Amino acid sequence: MAEWHDTTEEYLEAILEIEEEGTIPIRARLVERLGLSAPAVSETVNRLVDHGYAELLDDRSLRLTDKGREVATSIVRRHRLAERLLVDIIGLEWEKVHKEADRWEHAISADVEEKLVQLLGDPATCPHGNPIPGSAHKVEGPASVPLTQLQPGPVIVRRISEKVEIDDDAIAFLAGAELIPGSNAVVIRTSTDGVQVKSATGEQTVPRKLAQLMYVIPA
């Protein structure tokens, strides 16, 4: 039962994160997101539907029920609080915290969650800039847009998509280039290959696929 509980949380978390990106959740995106086979994903999705966590719509997309959304929101909140703890208090490297928080999120009780909020000061975002559900603090300032959409000039990195966090090479590239939330950079030019930027470590080209998942604001 514990294994099914963790699997349920992982799937619901993935569906909610796909929604956050403005994308329609379908089984193919869960296959990509979770790195599992299509038959395995289909079997688990059917169980989610049978247990009342999600609905399979006529267009084959998935929609969380109120029950499923409550669980998904809770696990995303615990995950992002765990990431803040790992970075802010423990000092784990930014690029390592996502996978570590994946291990922690299932073990954090309501009492521990409450203490984490007090310890961390009820943060608005995780270290990757994504909002923590239920925080009393909201992200202020102009809405961020993908790096590919801005004209040349200075920018501030606001957040990195959850989709990037599961890509070891991409997250390592951003850490090495110091293109993490809160950092400053200058967009030099945008091309079909990507976005050439100058950061604290010098000039580099951010591949277009990655740049589309980096959200920035004009500096």
Sequence positions of predicted segments:
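Short alpha-helical segments that sit at the start of domains
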Residues: 1-12
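Short acidic, hydrophobic short linear motifs in intrinsically disordered regions
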Residues: 21-31
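Basic amphipathic alpha-helical segments that dock to polyanions
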Residues: 11, 30, 41-51, 174, ...
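A short, conserved structural fragment
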Residues: 49-59
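Mid-protein regulatory/catalytic core that forms ligand/cofactor-binding pockets
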Residues: 105-212
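Basic, amphipathic "hinge/linker" alpha-helix immediately C-terminal to the N-terminal HTH DNA-binding motif
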Residues: 60-79
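Key DNA-contact positions within bacterial/archaeal DNA-binding proteins
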Residues: 39, 95
